[in-house]
């Protein structure tokens, strides 16, 4: 099984560039369309749907209004290889237009994790399966 996770976005190109710069993932060029961009690995595709996708998916009545903040009802957790890679990525988030909601911390289940927000307000986490030395 391969997971494809999509975000509904106002600016698909900017969102793709944010995550591409943050994670260093290649674009899934074969999936590119006027209303879709994606990043892809052998294990997953991370997609960005334009606003037109709400109607296409019969979700127009659930499309957030521009003046309202979208509630957090789900979030992706992207697993990185090392605590150092996580710290480096988190340090880039503000310069890329995102927000650090919770700086890297040791979870009670032994992961090194940060809670972040992309430029359009989607919440996501970066995590690793190990803790940095001394944490």
Q: Model segments located where?
A:
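Short secondary-structure boundary/capping segments
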Residues: 37-38, 64-68, 106
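Core segments of cupin and vicinal oxygen chelate
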Residues: 6-55
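N-terminal beta-strand motif that seeds the catalytic metal site of vicinal oxygen chelate
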Residues: 1-17, 73-78, 129-135
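Vicinal oxygen chelate
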Residues: 90-135
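Residue-level marker for the onset of beta-strands and adjacent loop->beta junctions
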Residues: 3, 33-35, 74, 110-112
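Mid-chain, well-packed structural core segment of small domains
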Residues: 70-91, 97-98
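Short, flexible, mixed-charge acidic loops at enzyme active sites
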Residues: 52-67
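Hydrophobic pocket/interface hotspot
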Residues: 15, 19, 86, 93
């Amino acid at each position: 099984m391969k997971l494809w996770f999509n975000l509904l976005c106002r600016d698909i190109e900017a969102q793709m560039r944010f995550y591409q710069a943050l994670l260093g993932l290649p674009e899934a060029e074969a999936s590119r369309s006027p209303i879709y961009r994606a990043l892809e690995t052998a294990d997953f595709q991370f997609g960005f749907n334009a606003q037109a996708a709400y109607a296409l998916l019969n979700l127009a009545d659930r499309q957030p209004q521009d003046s309202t903040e979208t509630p957090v009802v789900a979030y992706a957790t992207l697993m990185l290889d090392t605590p150092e890679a996580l710290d480096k990525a988190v340090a880039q988030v503000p310069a890329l237009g995102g927000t650090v909601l919770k700086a890297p911390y040791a979870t009670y289940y032994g992961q090194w994790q940060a809670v972040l927000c992309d430029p359009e307000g989607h919440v996501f986490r970066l995590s690793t399966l190990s803790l940095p030395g001394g944490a």
